[in-house]
Amino acid sequence: MLKDWDGVESLDSKGAVAFHAIYIHLVQNIFQDELQSFGDGSFDTFYSLKYIRTQAIRSIFDGKTNLWVDNVKTVKKETLNDIVNKSFEDAFIFLKVKYGNPSELKWGDVHQVTYEHNLDADPLVQRLINFSVGPFPMAGSEMTPRAASYSVSKPFDVRAGSSMRRIIDFSDFDNGYSILPTGQSGLFRSKHYRDQTEMYNRGEFKPFMFTYDAINSSKSSKLVFKSK
């Protein structure tokens, strides 16, 4: 799966599944034994600190430090090769137990996003209305320009991404493009509540007008607010 992978985290990528499963367990096998002494949740907090985590891993693989490599909870003194091999094995077991045959998994099968609404935290509201939108398969990850990061405690559920994507032409502000994760309206019954979701998920954009004349000439409807 990794040998033939082009490094692109597309929805149909099998290599992306293998890479991220191995990466999660690699980080766990290197750091978790030491971090557990700081209390529950310490490893999750460390994993969320992307820059620190990435720099630490680079330092280890560049040979600048081996302080974290050995598992302090075992008698054996592990080498980096031991940790890497264990991470491959752990990743395979994790994927097989949770999803079935790892060789058949595609990134979009496991890496998914639900645009959650706070009101859905109430089980009754969720059952009656369900303000949330999703789930949907999502390409990319925290390691790509198309940001879609997941929590290590719940791989591979997307927990964060871009709140808006926008392209600005500074020579012509009316020649811009933008897209939102769900829609322009926060009103649940509005046709614009979730009408941008599929485009956002596919990495597409909508024209973004800036000047009054451009907006007025391309409008499809008009909403007027009147005070009383």
Region spans (language model):
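Long, compositionally biased non-active-site segments enriched in small/hydrophobic residues and glycine
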Residues: 1-228
